[in-house]
Amino acid sequence: MIILCLTIFANIFKPGWTGANERTFLAVKPDGVQRRLVGEIIRRFERKGFKLVGMKLLQASEAQLRQHYWELREKPFYNGLVKYMSSGPIVAMVWQGLDVVKTARKMLGETNPADSLPGTIRGDYCVEVGRNVIHGSDSVESAAREISLWFEDHELFCYEECGQHWIYA
């Protein structure tokens, strides 16, 4: 009985979604991969103090992309977005840290690179909204959905970083 209760609580209160354990999903899009920006993007998130807990290079299927961008299905650019995102490999990543969803969105910049400030990823590396280098979850709820779409539980790692005490009080 105790094991059953612990299993239920473990599934209800999953680690990784609040406080310093909050997680977000990022995907370097085909243009970012082709332009060799993956390392620069990882560098920025590591230097900010976030922890990489999952990453893979993959060719996304059209079905997976349609599910990922389901909320945009009525938009005129939807089919083009799916076609573009399946045109080459992407790098899917899960990052963890305090307020990582909100902070990652600020680090990415606006969806339209023309509206992005210098110092943001899109402000520094993009010129066109259709080729804006990177996707990032827009909420904790979206992050949970997107992470479960792109990663299985065994592909995400929990580990203690030796420098974590220098980042979090």
From Swiss-Prot:
What membrane topology was assigned to this protein in its record? Peripheral membrane protein
For this UniProt record, the keywords arranged alphabetically read as follows: ATP-binding, Cell projection, Cytoplasm, Cytoskeleton, Kinase, Membrane, Mitochondrion, Mitochondrion outer membrane, Nucleotide-binding, Transferase
Give the binding site residues for ADP.
Answer: K29, R105, T111, R122, V129, N132
Principal localisation: mitochondrion
A cellular component term, taken from the record's GO annotations: ciliary basal body
Task: For this entry, list what GO says about its biological process.
Answer: CTP biosynthetic process; determination of left/right symmetry; DNA repair; GTP biosynthetic process; kidney development; mitochondrial fusion; nucleoside triphosphate biosynthetic process; positive regulation of adenylate cyclase-activating G protein-coupled receptor signaling pathway
Write out the catalytic residues in the record: H135
Q: Which residues cross the membrane?
A: none
The record's HAMAP family line, in alphabetical order, gives: NDP_kinase
Please give the function described in this protein's UniProt entry. Catalyzes the phosphorylation of ribonucleosides and deoxyribonucleoside diphosphates, other than ATP, into the corresponding triphosphates with ATP as the major phosphate donor. The ATP gamma phosphate is transferred to the nucleoside diphosphate beta phosphate via a ping-pong mechanism, using a phosphorylated active-site intermediate. Through the catalyzed exchange of gamma-phosphate between di- and triphosphonucleosides participates in regulation of intracellular nucleotide homeostasis. Required for ciliary function during renal development.
Q: What is this protein called?
A: Nucleoside diphosphate kinase 3
- Identify the species of origin: Danio rerio (Zebrafish)
